[in-house]
Amino acid sequence: MSEDQDLGITQSKIHNTGEWYAEVVQKAELANYGPEGMSGFIVTRPRAYGLWERVQSYLDTRFKQTGVQNAYFPLFIPEGYLEREKEIVEGFDPEVAWVEQAGRNELEERLAVRPTSESIIAPYLSQWIRSYRDLPLRVNQWTSVVRWEATETKPFFRTKEFLWQEGHTAHATRADAWAETMLRLNQYESTYEDLLAIPVLQGAKPEHDKFPGADTTTTVEALMPDGKSVQGATSHYLGTEFADAFDITYTDTDETSRVAHTTSWGLSWRALGALIMTHSDNQGLVLPPTVAPEQVVIVPIWQTETKERVLEYAEDVANNLDDAGIRVELDDRDDQNPGFKFNEWELKGVPLRAEIGPDEATEGTVTLIHRPDGESITAERSEIVETVQEQFDAVYAKLYAAAEETLNSNIRIAETRSELLGTIGQHGGYVKTPWCGDEGCETAIKDEIAAEIVMVPISSDEDDEQDTTDENMGVNNDTTVESNEKSLDLTDSTCVVCDNPAFKTAYFAKSY
């Protein structure tokens, strides 16, 4: 096999999506699979970690602007801590990795390797909170968690260990905690839409699929080109259950002891999986300029007699872009031809290529090529910074528009069971259906076609009824605040599975 053949992508995104994805991840130098005997673990290479750092920077800035402070809590959680919240134990027990021995000595109490941190953070919130003056309290940690999932692993989508952030807050009232829940959900939506060029749907998880111990789990869902949904991030209103279990109380203005309302919210490197899957093509990785390690690659094209002049011009352009804060790479290697360089940088996903040959050097121009579609733009040297920045916006808009078209054209409605099964089987995507709210009806569809309810819409019907003083009333999954996804008209509707009256709109989809 020649070097050019080895460099390129050999699988088809449309026909062999799984193999194509794995090939892009490895050949674009994003990750390697872990050591033999450690199925489900990956080695994150610098290019992928750089993507994660840009996601981290984007979110961390917004968290801090809205009162969040970073902290770090232990990797290990005593078994007794987990057992204090029954639903956490039941929800995560099959996925928990346990430490039972240190050196040659058996531990007195097993330690869970962090699957999530509510049970180790809540006891400290209890210590730190004494009065209403200590509220709201907001902490976040950037860390990794381990969930020993039995399902097939896929780099960045499903791995036993993964990077994420998890935020945890405590509030005096249900209304404040719910506002926090939605604030973080909106920040996650912005991360996908304004940083990663991926449109998402906002909704809530059905009652049986919410986070263990949560009152309400909200979600942003992204649709991949193969018609499967990705849970992009979740934000949980935990009510008072965790606060009751861990004694998170505060003294109110009237000296009354009250139970706090808590939230937790997280986004993992699954966002990178969605980024890779959404935009990349059969030539390799495609990245928006917002997160690309190199936003522009300059490829000089010369003959022996023009080399010095072309390189001098290219270096001047590179310095100009670098001074403007643009991430630029000048590929002046002389052991590879321009065609090889074009293919290599396309594979690595650089959004904009600048070609500079003798003609450009003579005429005072730069030829700019868009990575997504190969569109060519001639830029004046004197306006190169402004033009490059304009082309960044153009590339981002192209990527978002393509992803938005995929999403909008793949939301369908089914009013019968046969329509639901046929639509998912033929098209994939999201199928909106009337649903009675019974988990058994979802299970029947899941058993037949491996599709599940990924979300139900959030509406504003009962938002005004949120009581800021009632500590025990939960938030209804369907009727809390406005969302960008609307319910079907369920007047006289029946569930597509059991024909009982329908009370909810369910979004069915296959998912990662």
Swiss-Prot record:
InterPro entries: aa-tRNA-synt_IIb, aa-tRNA-synth_II, aa-tRNA-synth_II/BPL/LPL, Anticodon-bd, Anticodon-bd_dom_sf, Pro-tRNA-ligase_IIa, Pro-tRNA-ligase_IIa_arc-type, Pro-tRNA_ligase_II_C. It catalyses: tRNA(Pro) + L-proline + ATP = L-prolyl-tRNA(Pro) + AMP + diphosphate. The keyword Aminoacyl-tRNA synthetase applies. It is found in: Cytoplasm. It is an enzyme of class 6 (ligase). PROSITE patterns: AA_TRNA_LIGASE_II (PS50862). CDD domains: ProRS_anticodon_zinc (cd00862), ProRS_core_arch_euk (cd00778). One of its GO terms (biological process) is prolyl-tRNA aminoacylation. It comes from the Archaea. Residues 460-470 have a biased composition (Acidic residues). The gene is proS. Homodimer. This is Proline--tRNA ligase. Belongs to the class-II aminoacyl-tRNA synthetase family. ProS type 3 subfamily. Keywords: Aminoacyl-tRNA synthetase, ATP-binding, Cytoplasm, Ligase, Nucleotide-binding, Protein biosynthesis. Residues 460-484 are annotated as: Disordered. PANTHER family: BIFUNCTIONAL GLUTAMATE_PROLINE--TRNA LIGASE, PROLYL-TRNA SYNTHETASE. Disulfide bonds: none annotated. Pfam families: HGTP_anticodon (PF03129), ProRS-C_1 (PF09180), tRNA-synt_2b (PF00587). Catalyzes the attachment of proline to tRNA(Pro) in a two-step reaction: proline is first activated by ATP to form Pro-AMP and then transferred to the acceptor end of tRNA(Pro). Its EC number is 6.1.1.15. Consists of three domains: the N-terminal catalytic domain, the anticodon-binding domain and the C-terminal extension.
